[in-house]
């Protein structure tokens, strides 16, 4: 923890400086590469980690080296990871997908905003200083048309987004030639289909079947296409957002950029404080990854935080507002039904979901069914017009391991399965949210129940936390559960930071949560046997055995921390080529000893072979030349 806590003014000033000086930055010894597709404009970014050669022999004066292949890795940082791209947060990112959207000819620009709230914000001159200057003219589907990736997939259309994703998911592994790097243990996939090569047709088929989603609002053309599904790489979401008591627009944009740098595949803006609308505009215009929200939070702000005063009309206006800004997926707590609320009465921790508790309070105060459930078809009509995916929220998720897998949790899950089928009638993409707090032995049931009752729609879980005893370390307690459920088939993991249950995360907390969850997601990919998942591990192990310290740092998920820990005890440059580290020292390094054993064994094999040949020579009489019949 930092020794000096910054004041609010200092935090804002630091964030503003970050934004003002922001430029594309590569990780150490990495470079940005692009792989092109067949569709115009399909140019898929990846990060390529450059490695040093391996010393294989020769003398001190004339050493002999063997080259090591560069390792391509999935990169979520967008333009922020390319030093060749000029960054201007005031202008936003380039609109990568705009030509693809326009070419389909099924959208139209809106001459007037659909949301009354948006109209009021735009008319308020007092917000000019906060407003993003380059606001897009929003689009929506033409009358009678649907513009979702699910609709196109069902029509047999392979979109540029689908080709982009296919290239991205393969992670450039076709470039790797080394058998050492390509070696991979068989996985246990629990029924997942993991083809050796992911094609655009495979992507289309998975989306058409509802097993995967491509969150890609037509009003967020800055986003780089990505996919969430059991048969693809496990993804990670990062939550950001201001509150009524802390954070600013500058800090949230900083956290967005920071999140994409450290591997967030999507980002959820959970803002609940002032200027939600303006904050979200800045985030969307500068985000290369899909953005999700929980619209009920903002709807509640519009009725001064009084849950009983919520109305369908206020919520609908919020959906239109956010859809026309470009939000890629909505978390909707439509499965919290009136009859399920009493099921939570005997729980230790009741209803812990903010959205779930809001809707439960509304249902009880009006003694009516959840208006999100009642108006679900209208929600789907809105989503179909903008290609907003639905993330069906688990408002009754367990908030303690004592409450795990109870009647309320699974009753809601079954309702989410019913709602999934309704959304699919409108060609709306759907994923299902899951818990929560679940001990290890009870985790797998969550996945099997979801697959069965939600028709294999992608599962998206918060952890789950496997124990409740570690406030301040819940990124660890949940990372364990996240790795397990990712292995069982969960498609996306929502990160948990060290501040979970304690406070709003800052920039460093975001990084810690993301690194923890990237580890969990990667461990799940390895366990499933995802093709190519082991390449980076093999490269790291090879570098470690060969004492290529710089390569070890650069192959790490966090090169800076790896280097810092090494340099705490061996800061000299000579320490970067030493055949030991400070843990064991030069005399007891297991890998150095292992190398010596290997060299000794190889020498012994040669000497034994020479001895065998000598014995054979003497047995044949010691003649240099043998008679033809003896040869």
Curated annotation (Swiss-Prot):
Name the Pfam families for this protein: ThiC-associated (PF13667), ThiC_Rad_SAM (PF01964)
Q: What class of enzyme is it?
A: lyase
Q: Which reaction does it catalyse?
A: 5-amino-1-(5-phospho-beta-D-ribosyl)imidazole + S-adenosyl-L-methionine = 4-amino-2-methyl-5-(phosphooxymethyl)pyrimidine + CO + 5'-deoxyadenosine + formate + L-methionine + 3 H(+)
Gene Ontology molecular functions = 4 iron, 4 sulfur cluster binding; carbon-carbon lyase activity; zinc ion binding
User: Binding residues for Zn(2+), per the UniProt record?
Assistant: 437, 501
Q: What cofactors does the UniProt entry give for this protein?
A: [4Fe-4S] cluster
Q: Which InterPro entries match?
A: ThiC (IPR037509), ThiC-associated_dom (IPR025747), ThiC/Bza_core_dom (IPR038521), ThiC/BzaA/B (IPR002817)
Cellular component terms per the entry's GO annotation:
cytosol
The job of this chain, per UniProt, is described as:
Catalyzes the synthesis of the hydroxymethylpyrimidine phosphate (HMP-P) moiety of thiamine from aminoimidazole ribotide (AIR) in a radical S-adenosyl-L-methionine (SAM)-dependent reaction.
Keywords, sorted A to Z: 4Fe-4S, Iron, Iron-sulfur, Lyase, Metal-binding, S-adenosyl-L-methionine, Thiamine biosynthesis, Zinc
What residues bind [4Fe-4S] cluster, as annotated? 581, 584, 589
Q: E.C. number, please?
A: 4.1.99.17
Q: In which pathway does it act?
A: Cofactor biosynthesis; thiamine diphosphate biosynthesis
- Give the note describing cofactor binding and stoichiometry: Binds 1 [4Fe-4S] cluster per subunit. The cluster is coordinated with 3 cysteines and an exchangeable S-adenosyl-L-methionine.
* Gene coding for it: thiC
Residues that hold substrate according to the record: 239, 268, 297, 333, 353-355, 394-397, 433, 460
The UniProt subunit note reads as follows: Homodimer.
Q: What's one GO BP annotation on this UniProt entry?
A: thiamine diphosphate biosynthetic process
Which HAMAP family does the record match to this protein?
ThiC (MF_00089)
Family, similarity comment: Belongs to the ThiC family.
Q: What protein am I looking at?
A: Phosphomethylpyrimidine synthase
Q: Which organism is it from?
A: Escherichia coli (strain 55989 / EAEC)
């Amino acid at each position: 923890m930092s020794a000096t806590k910054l004041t609010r003014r200092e935090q804002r000033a630091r964030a503003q400086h970050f934004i003002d000086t922001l430029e594309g930055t590569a990780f150490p010894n990495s470079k940005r590469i692009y792989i092109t597709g067949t569709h115009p404009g399909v140019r898929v970014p990846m990060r390529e980690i450059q490695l040093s050669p391996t010393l294989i022999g020769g003398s001190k004066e004339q050493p002999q080296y063997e080259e090591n292949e560069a390792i391509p890795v999935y990169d979520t940082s967008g333009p922020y990871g390319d030093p060749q791209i000029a960054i201007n947060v005031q202008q936003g990112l380039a609109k990568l997908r705009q030509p693809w959207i326009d070419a389909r000819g099924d959208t139209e620009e809106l001459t007037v905003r659909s949301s009354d709230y948006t109209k009021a914000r735009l008319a308020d001159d007092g917000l000019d200083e906060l407003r993003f200057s380059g606001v897009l003219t929003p689009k929506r589907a033409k009358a009678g048309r649907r513009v979702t990736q699910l609709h196109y997939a069902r029509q047999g259309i392979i979109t540029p987004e689908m080709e982009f994703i296919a290239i991205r998911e393969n992670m450039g592994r076709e470039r790797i030639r080394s058998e050492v790097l390509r070696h991979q243990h068989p996985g246990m996939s629990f029924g997942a289909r993991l083809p050796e090569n992911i094609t655009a047709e495979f992507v289309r088929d998975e989306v058409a079947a509802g097993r995967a989603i491509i969150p890609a609002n037509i009003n967020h053309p800055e986003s780089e296409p990505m996919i969430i599904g059991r048969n693809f790489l496990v993804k990670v979401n990062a939550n950001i957002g201001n509150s009524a008591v802390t954070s600013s627009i500058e800090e949230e944009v900083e956290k967005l950029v920071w999140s994409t740098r450290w591997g967030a595949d999507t980002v959820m803006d959970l803002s609940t404080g002032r200027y939600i609308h303006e904050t979200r505009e800045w985030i969307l215009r500068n985000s290369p990854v899909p953005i999700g929200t929980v619209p009920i939070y903002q709807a509640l702000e519009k009725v001064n935080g009084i849950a009983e005063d919520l109305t369908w009309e206020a919520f609908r206006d919020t959906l239109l507002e956010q859809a026309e800004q470009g939000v890629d997926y909505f978390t909707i707590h439509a499965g919290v039904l009136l009859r399920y609320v009493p099921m939570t009465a005997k729980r230790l921790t009741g209803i812990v979901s903010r959205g779930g508790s809001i809707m439960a309070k509304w249902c009880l105060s009006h003694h009516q069914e959840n208006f999100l459930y009642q108006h679900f078809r209208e929600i789907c009509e809105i989503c179909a017009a903008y290609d907003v995916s639905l993330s069906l929220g688990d408002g009754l998720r367990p908030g303690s391991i004592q409450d795990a897998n109870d009647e309320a949790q699974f009753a809601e899950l079954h309702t989410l399965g019913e709602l999934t089928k309704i959304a699919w009638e409108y060609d709306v993409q759907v994923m299902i949210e899951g818990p929560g707090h679940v001990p290890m032995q009870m985790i797998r049931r969550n996945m099997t129940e979801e697959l069965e009752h939600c028709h294999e729609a992608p599962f998206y879980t918060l952890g789950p936390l496997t124990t409740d005893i570690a406030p301040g370390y819940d990124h660890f307690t949940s990372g364990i559960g996240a790795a397990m459920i990712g292995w069982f088939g969960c498609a996306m993991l929502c990160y948990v930071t060290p501040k979970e249950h304690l406070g709003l995360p800052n920039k460093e907390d975001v990084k810690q949560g993301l690194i923890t969850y990237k580890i969990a997601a990667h461990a799940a990919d390895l366990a499933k046997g995802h093709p190519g998942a082991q390449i980076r591990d093999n490269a790291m192990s090879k570098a470690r055995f060969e004492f290529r310290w710089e390569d070890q740092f650069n192959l790490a998920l966090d090169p800076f921390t790896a280097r810092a820990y090494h340099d705490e005890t061996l800061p000299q440059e000579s320490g970067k080529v030493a055949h030991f580290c400070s843990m064991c020292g030069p005399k007891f390094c297991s890998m150095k000893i292992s190398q010596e054993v290997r060299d000794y064994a190889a020498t012994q094999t040669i000497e034994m072979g020479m001895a065998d040949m000598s014995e054979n020579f003497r047995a044949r009489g010691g003649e240099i030349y043998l008679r033809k019949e003896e040869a």
